[in-house]
Amino acid sequence: MAAAASPPRGFCRSVHWFRRGLRLHDNPALQAALRGAASLRCIYILDPWFAASSAVGINRWRFLLQSLEDLDNSLRKLNSRLFVVRGQPTDVFPRLFKEWGVTRLAFEYDSEPFGKERDAAIIKLAKEAGVEVVIENSHTLYNLDRIIELNGNKPPLTYKRFQAIISRMELPKKPVSSIVSQQMETCKVDIQENHDDVYGVPSLEELGFPTDGLAPAVWQGGETEALARLDKHLERKAWVANYERPRMNANSLLASPTGLSPYLRFGCLSCRLFYYRLWELYKKVKRNSTPPLSLYGQLLWREFFYTAATNNPKFDRMEGNPICIQIPWDKNPEALAKWAEGKTGFPWIDAIMTQLRQEGWIHHLARHAVACFLTRGDLWISWESGVRVFDELLLDADFSVNAGSWMWLSCSAFFQQFFHCYCPVGFGRRTDPSGDYVKRYLPKLKGFPSRYIYEPWNAPESVQKAAKCIIGVDYPKPMVNHAETSRLNIERMKQIYQQLSRYRGLCLLASVPSCVEDLSGPVTDSAPGQGSSTSTAVRLPQSDQASPKRKHEGAEELCTEELYKRAKVTGLPAPEIPGKSS
């Protein structure tokens, strides 16, 4: 996309604007900035005031700053530097255009509503200054607008429908080559002696974060770490040979040296590189057979939520959100605070929230457990509150995936087929019978025997004294009776969906069981796109389920506007909802 005519070759003074996409590999916008350029400056715009006032926590800021340091180090090896410019983009660019004589601005396409609005303002400023603008897509695998177009100009609202659409599309573009020193030789710029003072990567202290007592980072930011992790990740993929889901265990809950989600979120790792490295590995192992879509579950769910959010600026809230069912959640700030601070009295939930606050990451099934507990499982608090807490604490949280996941897990959108209800005792016990995970993050409970580690309130007083932890004194009592509240909340959700279905005469969801089933069986470490479920999920009896095909067809026929009309009828008055608190 160009906002002005391209300058003659050799006279182009380029600026590449890093936002996400914090990498030199597979960066088509950076390659475009280099093409025919006489000079190139790579910038990142950071507003210190925003950093000090935003709700984003210290772990995510640290990861970002580490990623910028790594990017600067990589550019140094190419005889260049990263220019971290302080301020707002709309204030910064008019000054830089004049000061540096910029003739071309390149950046990666941002599909999220806020990003598109910001970029439109910068494109306007560039056009007024006679600066060519080049935008390339590399943060998503597909052209999201094309997916929407193929779905009748509306985003697909089920993952199955999304898969059907992309299966008709061309494969994602292959990653472009990494930047090499020869490309930078002809477009060097003078680096001033005071560069670090003026354009250096700031410290956490400069951004207003206290660092006394800050534990070492569990996740090291940056492209260098991302590529090393990718290699390790693929080495671990021996299971691809038989394509068996890995079994869930206590070690699965800990931060893995092969984990990639924060690196994909910040663009330290290209999703296209990840996609094609998986592709190559599968074809090597399977002797050139075509990889199934399920191989890319992590990437495709990410793509699904990006598609759903791209034209929906209200995607992270209920009000005005055309795809969100308007469920009458309770407002309970005290209960929300206990959940967010890991003080619910359920060790499994509290250990997860403690890990999240300390490290900035939790396993995706742990996310399911705490999301269910906050929303439809136990506390009946809006998913919007969960979005805000995760946005503060989670390294890989972004607008689309974070909000989309919370709507999905709370049964507020994307047509959940089953009413999973993760048991805050049984799920943890099956995953880690010895309770090592709980003892790691809640050391005050380490004296309890495994028998009581997930429900210490049931331990005899003598056991509590021996463990030096009295429940109700040293560790809180459970804030709810899970068996009772989960049954009530399932009934509330059942009423909501029954009324929603009656409104147009469609069965959007299967009928809901009147009691919680606690099924036995192994827990599998599967992604949502691979049909994730656990032994502690509430599943519907097979005899009570509507045909999955019929349900999907009915759901997918709904256009966004029709769904919103239906969703509004679920704002039931309190007396009509069993268990509704005043």
Swiss-Prot record:
Induction info: Exhibits some circadian rhythm expression. Levels increase slightly during subjective day peaking at 10 hours. Levels decrease between 14 hours and 18 hours to peak again at 20 hours-22 hours.
Sequence positions that bind FAD: S261, Q298, H364, D396, A397, D398
Matches recorded under Pfam families: DNA_photolyase (PF00875), FAD_binding_7 (PF03441)
Annotated cofactor note: Binds 1 FAD per subunit.
InterPro entries: Crypto/Photolyase_FAD-like_sf (IPR036134), Crypto/Photolyase_N_sf (IPR036155), Cryptochr/Photolyase_FAD-bd (IPR005101), Cryptochrome/DNA_photolyase_1 (IPR002081), DNA_photolyase_N (IPR006050), Rossmann-like_a/b/a_fold (IPR014729)
GO biological-process terms attached to the record: circadian regulation of gene expression; circadian rhythm; entrainment of circadian clock by photoperiod; negative regulation of circadian rhythm; negative regulation of DNA-templated transcription; regulation of circadian rhythm; response to light stimulus
Name recorded for this polypeptide: Cryptochrome-2
Organism of origin: Gallus gallus (Chicken)
Gene: CRY2
